[in-house]
Curated annotation (Swiss-Prot):
Protein name: Transmembrane protein 145
GO cellular component: membrane
One Pfam short name: GPR180-TMEM145_TM
Transmembrane segments: 2-22, 182-202, 214-234, 248-268, 283-303, 325-345, 356-376, 388-408
Predominant subcellular localization, coarse grouping: membrane
Record lineage: Eukaryota, Metazoa, Chordata, Craniata, Vertebrata
UniProt subcellular location: Membrane
Protein encoded by which gene: tmem145
Keywords in alphabetical order: Glycoprotein, Membrane, Transmembrane, Transmembrane helix
Highest taxon above the source species: Eukaryota
Residues carrying covalently attached carbohydrate according to the record: 28, 102, 243, 443, 453, 464
Coiled-coil spans in chain: none
Length: 547
């Protein structure tokens, strides 16, 4: 996907977006139908209130506002039932429950009166209705005129729950969403700041790898998404409408954060930046195809939700073919993740300290997303679903980010730290399939962020990759009368030179040669690259060469 695909996709989605039927709704309806749906709202059991303003030509009299609730004998029994006509749909209404508002001057509670505009008579109705029920319920508002010549209505409705800023314009299934989003925003800001601090430490140690940068990017996008959600819901709390474009952008960023994090997990499972420096060409193609497919299904999911979801039904995002396709892709990603981790552990068993908790923690995460979607579709009551799903979804994202932040913290006490190869070593690899040397963890060498560890600088790596002290002196070339010292793991220890011609430190000087002239050239220690890239420098000496 090219660099301009992101803005283009955003404009496409915004173009598909329809104006949301918010808790303040207005419109102008003209249709040949005799029964139509207007809007829905989830009222509290005691504080629900509908304020309305209706106006229509007196010649179109008489029209009715019908109030259905979510009982199986009410709204589900009439909506999209082609075998029922207008009268049958009105018959399920219980007049004793005041579920009918007759828009005429004869019905006092409708507040209707005849007005004149441009020589034409109109019925203008301004009034309200309170709602009482045994629990929170979805209420559906419809307009009818059975046996007439169609419907015509100019309407304006305000649906509220109490007078508090946190509840007034919110449907009962949305209670707590704004507070929840604000709380998680603050938590994710803390996670982002901690990840930036850890990234600064890792950069100083040349351990700030691409996968950790992806984690920081995912956390940053998550923060931006939650910020936009808070802006949307805050504006919605004030006017009951909100800015739907901000909500769509927030959803896009939320999905982008999820996709970045998912890609990072698959890359880490394959050992990228932990046991290998690059992904093979075939692996890169597979990842590109998979992420493209996942992005397309997410896009289709957004378009389907915005364009094809029926506002007269309470639907969840994943209640669509694209939603179930997303769940299937999530399971496919988990299978890929399992295979990648097992292969990595097979070749690098010393990385079990990282990969075992990593695999266990994110197995729960991989299953949490589709299980949440299935429970939301079939197990949570519709009048409470949106607020519950919002909290669970944010909790799942928080779990994923918090676990990664903990297991990758750059602390000497962290035995799960995954990185041991410096970023400067990855860039000089010659083959894309070349693996890192077998080494447990570079984290055990963390002593200071700013001062080099001189002891490790002059240590010699053993065959298993760990640093070992020098037990035998390395015979540097010496000449007559030259005292020489040998470095060991204790930088202050001086070792006497070996026996030279049977006399310690003494050798005959050839005739005609001064002591100074007999000195042979000493060569600086050279750093030799072995197979892979050892973490520490080692000292090697060159043989004596004549002047």
């Amino acid at each position: 996907m090219g660099p301009h695909a992101g803005p283009g996709m955003l404009l496409l989605l915004l173009g598909f977006l329809r104006i949301s039927a918010a808790k303040y709704v207005r419109g102008n309806l003209t249709t040949k139908e005799d029964w139509v749906f207007l809007t829905r709202f989830c009222f509290l059991s005691d504080y629900g209130r509908l304020e309305f303003k209706f106006k229509y030509p007196e010649a179109k009299c008489c029209q009715n506002i019908l109030l259905y609730f979510d009982d199986t004998s009410q709204w589900p029994a009439v909506y999209k039932k082609d075998n029922k006509d207008c009268l049958m749909k009105e018959s399920v209404i219980r007049p004793e429950n005041n579920q009918v508002i007759n828009l005429t001057t004869q019905y006092v509670w409708s507040g209707c009166q005849v007005i004149k505009e441009a020589g034409q008579s109109y019925l203008s109705c301004n009034s309200g209705r309170s709602f009482r029920s045994v629990r929170e319920r979805w209420w559906y508002i419809a307009l009818s005129k059975c046996g007439g010549d169609g419907l015509q209505l100019e309407y304006e409705m305000t649906l509220t729950n109490g007078k508090s800023f946190w509840t007034r314009h919110f449907s009962a299934d949305e209670f707590g969403i704004l507070e929840t989003d604000i709380t998680f925003l603050l938590i994710f800001i803390l996670i982002l700041l901690l990840s930036c601090y850890f990234g600064y430490i890792l950069r100083g140690r040349q351990l700030l790898h691409t996968t950790y940068k992806m984690f920081m990017a995912a956390a940053g996008v998550e923060v931006l998404s939650l910020l936009l959600f808070c802006v949307y819901w805050g504006q919605y709390a004030q006017d009951g409408v909100g800015n739907s474009s901000i909500k769509v952008l927030a959803k896009l960023l939320f999905s982008a954060s999820f996709l970045i994090f998912l890609l990072m997990l698959i890359l880490l499972g394959k050992g990228f930046t932990v046991t290998r420096g690059r992904i093979s060409h075939l692996g890169s193609i597979k990842l590109s195809v998979y992420m493209t497919l996942y992005t397309v299904t997410h896009t289709v999911l957004f378009i389907h939700e915005a364009q094809f979801f029926d506002p007269a039904q309470v639907l969840y995002t994943y209640e669509s073919p694209a939603g179930y396709g997303n769940i299937a892709l999530q399971f496919l990603a988990y299978i890929w993740f399992c295979y990648a981790v097992l292969v990595t552990l097979k070749h690098f068993p010393e990385k079990q300290a990282f990969y075992v908790p990593f695999f266990a923690a994110y197995t729960l995460w991989f299953f949490a997303v589709p299980v949440m979607a299935l429970i939301a579709n079939f197990g949570i009551p519709k009048w409470a679903r949106e607020k519950i799903v919002n909290g669970i979804q944010l909790g799942i994202h928080l779990y994923a980010h918090a676990v990664f932040l903990i297991i990758t913290r750059p602390s000497a006490a962290n035995k799960n730290f995954p990185y041991h190869v410096r970023t400067s070593q990855i860039g000089i690899m010659e083959q894309s399939t070349e693996k890192f040397p077998h080494h447990v963890y570079g984290n055990v060498t963390f002593i200071s962020d700013s001062v080099p560890n001189v002891t490790e600088l002059f240590s010699i790596p053993s065959s298993n990759g760990s640093s070992a002290g020098i037990t035998k002196p390395v015979p540097y070339p010496v000449t007559l009368g030259q005292c020489y010292s040998q470095l060991t793991s204790d930088s202050h220890q001086v070792i006497s030179p070996p026996l030279l011609n049977g006399v310690p430190g003494v050798q005959k000087v050839p005739v005609g040669e001064t002591q100074l002239g007999g000195l042979q050239q000493l060569h600086a220690p050279q750093i030799h690259h072995q197979n892979g890239f050892p973490e520490y420098f080692s000292i090697r000496s060159a043989g004596p060469q004549p002047m």
